[in-house]
Amino acid sequence: MAKLIFLFATLALFVLLANASIQTTVIEVDEEEDNQLWRCQRQFLQHQRLRACQRFIHRRAQFGGQPDELEDEVEDDNDDENQPRRPALRQCCNQLRQVDRPCVCPVLRQAAQQVLQRQIIQGPQQLRRLFDAARNLPNICNIPNIGACPFRAWP
């Protein structure tokens, strides 16, 4: 009988330890996710909220078209007169290449959401084009190892 009680006590201790380690793992994953989100938010702000990408996304949402048709779109938000004015798509791609790979899709989602908040989007077709443009920018800009971003059209 004493052996049976000892066996059950040992088994209960193992279950308790396994449960505690599972909870610790979950907490560590949550902290890691929070750090990743914070790092991506910092990069979004550091790269001027990807204004060139926002401009490109906005034009694609409103007018559709292929990226090469919008290549001549010039970034208007250029306050520094010493910097040459460059097409919005090219400037967007340059900004995206400076973002850490794990943050590319999160910052593009933020850029699309900012366009959605600031601009008048008329109907579901423009909304779909807006998020399609943001989702496909890594492919358009040839960002290695990213492909299309996995977010959906509804923020």
From Swiss-Prot:
Assembly and binders: Heterodimer of a small A and a large B chain linked by disulfide bonds.
Pyrrolidone carboxylic acid carried by residues: Q36, Q83
CDD domains named among the record's database cross-references: AAI_SS
Species whose genome carries this gene: Capparis masaikai
One Pfam family recorded for the sequence: Tryp_alpha_amyl
Name of the featured protein: Sweet protein mabinlin-2
Similarity section: Belongs to the 2S seed storage albumins family.
Keywords: Disulfide bond, Pyrrolidone carboxylic acid, Seed storage protein, Signal, Storage protein, Taste-modifying protein
GO molecular function: nutrient reservoir activity
Record-linked InterPro entries: Bifun_inhib/LTP/seed_sf, Bifunc_inhib/LTP/seed_store, Napin/2SS/CON
Disulfide links within the chain: C40-C103, C53-C92, C93-C141, C105-C149
Residue spans of biased composition, Acidic residues class: 68-81
Purpose: Heat stable 2S seed storage protein having sweetness-inducing activity.
Annotated region described as Disordered, given as residue ranges: 64-86
Leader sequence residues: 1-20
Residue numbers covered by the propeptide annotation in the UniProt entry: 21-35, 69-82, 155
